[in-house]
């Protein structure tokens, strides 16, 4: 496994919709492993492929709960319910945090590393993290959804 360079904003790859994955091969498995390692070392809870310079619909999420590591390939949100408002940051925007409104519950359809389709339901912080990463895959940055930015001392 290797630690990948995290792309910082501004960079065109972060604002470009990603291609769907069609090849479920060893290259994809390596990308998933490297992304997860990179995310953990950077102390993140999610990482999308464009954040490491790869324009594919691939994301990893690990909010350090009982769910563990989630690999999302070609994900789409089928259902949203409720509302939550809270702080978000992004590994591509070091030191920047803002208040973002997200659905409190989501149902997602995605594929695993072998191409098998699965459904996932999430709520609370996990739902927030998944929505943030899926946005990345469509070239949408959290800064476009921020209602207000936090000062550094507000999140201590």
From Swiss-Prot:
Matches recorded under InterPro entries: Peptide_deformylase, Peptide_deformylase_sf
Catalytic activity annotation: N-terminal N-formyl-L-methionyl-[peptide] + H2O = N-terminal L-methionyl-[peptide] + formate
Binding residues for Fe cation: 90, 132, 136
Keywords: Hydrolase, Iron, Metal-binding, Protein biosynthesis
Cofactor(s) the record lists: Fe(2+)
GO biological process, any: co-translational protein modification
Active site: 133
GO MF entries: metal ion binding; peptide deformylase activity
Cofactor binding, per record: Binds 1 Fe(2+) ion.
EC number: 3.5.1.88
Signal sequence extent: none
Domain of life: Bacteria
Pfam family of the protein (one): Pep_deformylase
PANTHER family listed in its UniProt record: PEPTIDE DEFORMYLASE
Functional note: Removes the formyl group from the N-terminal Met of newly synthesized proteins. Requires at least a dipeptide for an efficient rate of reaction. N-terminal L-methionine is a prerequisite for activity but the enzyme has broad specificity at other positions.
Family according to the record: Belongs to the polypeptide deformylase family.
Name used for this protein in its record: Peptide deformylase 1
Originating species: Bacillus cereus (strain ATCC 14579 / DSM 31 / CCUG 7414 / JCM 2152 / NBRC 15305 / NCIMB 9373 / NCTC 2599 / NRRL B-3711)
Gene, per the UniProt record: def1
